[in-house]
Amino acid sequence: MLSNLSKSLLSKGKFINKNNLLKNKRSFGTIVPGDKFEWNDPLSLESLLTEEEVMIRDQVNKFCQDELMPRIQMAYRDEKFDREIMREYGKMGMLGATIPAYGGVSHVAYGLMANAVEKVDSGYRSAMSVQSSLVMHPINTFGTDAQKSKYLDGLASGDLVGCFGLTEPNAGSDPAGMQTRAVKNSAGNYVLNGTKTWITNSPIADVFVVWAKVENGDIRGFVLEKGMKGLSAPKIEGKLSLRASITGMIVMEDVEVPPTAMFPEVKGLRGPFSCLNKARYGIGWGSLGAAEFCYSTARQYGLDRKQFGKPLAANQLYQKKLADMATEISLGLQACYQVGRLIDAGKATPERISLIKRNSCGKSLDIARQSRDMLGGNGIADEYHVIRHAANLETVNTYEGTHDIHALILGRAITGIPSF
């Protein structure tokens, strides 16, 4: 039936062709018999993707399941990251993929890559996104032609590994409070002193993008190289999260570099924040990949496991939990998709990226915890993987801006009043 509003508009001649409109009742929400609800794609994200995006998603998913999934259980147990994975990413074209010279794929395609990798492990996705968003992006965007020529090809192939140094022991959510200094000496070179911490990839890095305050207080970016005198990157041991990602510090003790090591134009927090927004966007997609794995695992477990003479999935509460998971994942993916399209159209804002980063990470952590509970005692066994995802997501919900910091970013945008 036509709505009263539609009938009113028709009677007033507001539609061009009344007869065609009456025939085309699908315009008014009629369910087409051929349409089908898919438990793993409730809102048909698939229908929004281009052919190229579907192809990229399928190829990367296959690579992740065939090459990464068989290694993750022991990598997590042993707290070991396989350096060769970076070269494998390079061969797949997954590093710096949105940069025109290294693939030029859409941001939705990049998000699908991050999603596929994090279905396996958040640490594996961290290694990829740091290289792409926090190292290649600033060199490509802010670097000189010489810096681009020297580093980008090697980073894109995975022959070089990069890291990004912003967070410090006393400057986490407040990066403007950084204590790392770059002081010009009599020879005209910069001498860097300071410590960065919780740095993904630093112990194996060849290229270090670090941010420091120069003498006038401006924050400037520098590109350092492994082997420079006074530069070290000790590993942080004993993590109970992201164990398959290598994490360390960057220690700079009188590291002397020429002015050509500095990004020439960008000043202040605009530089590092542009990198963080790139990374946060990928995290929005990626964390939902971990949630999808946990949801799928809980669903299958509920269908297979029988208690009291019937599958766990036959219970109302179990189904309600699965319905909640499916709802949050599908809504979250639609939001990530929309922001990806906005980025490609040049219309994304930091607040929109904060919204999806905060929503995806918070909801994914809740889903992983719930999945762990639904598996009962098996939920803590690493062969089921959900406890690993839950532990990882505790970190993903924290880094690149904590859940609460993103709430404050949104609060400032909503009210116009900064609270930090």
From Swiss-Prot:
Chain sites annotated for binding substrate: R125, S126, S173, F273, S274, C275, L276, N277, R280
Main EC class the enzyme belongs to: oxidoreductase
GO CC annotation: mitochondrial matrix; mitochondrion
Active site, renumbered: E400 (proton acceptor)
Binding of FAD, residues: F164, G165, L166, T167, S173, W198, I199, T200, T402, F420
Entry keywords, A to Z: FAD, Flavoprotein, Mitochondrion, Oxidoreductase, Transit peptide
Catalytic activity: glutaryl-CoA + oxidized [electron-transfer flavoprotein] + 2 H(+) = (2E)-butenoyl-CoA + reduced [electron-transfer flavoprotein] + CO2
EC number: 1.3.8.6
Highest taxon of source: Eukaryota
Subcellular location: Mitochondrion matrix
Recorded GO MF terms: fatty-acyl-CoA binding; flavin adenine dinucleotide binding; glutaryl-CoA dehydrogenase activity
Main subcellular localisation: mitochondrion
Recorded family membership: Belongs to the acyl-CoA dehydrogenase family.
Protein name: Glutaryl-CoA dehydrogenase, mitochondrial
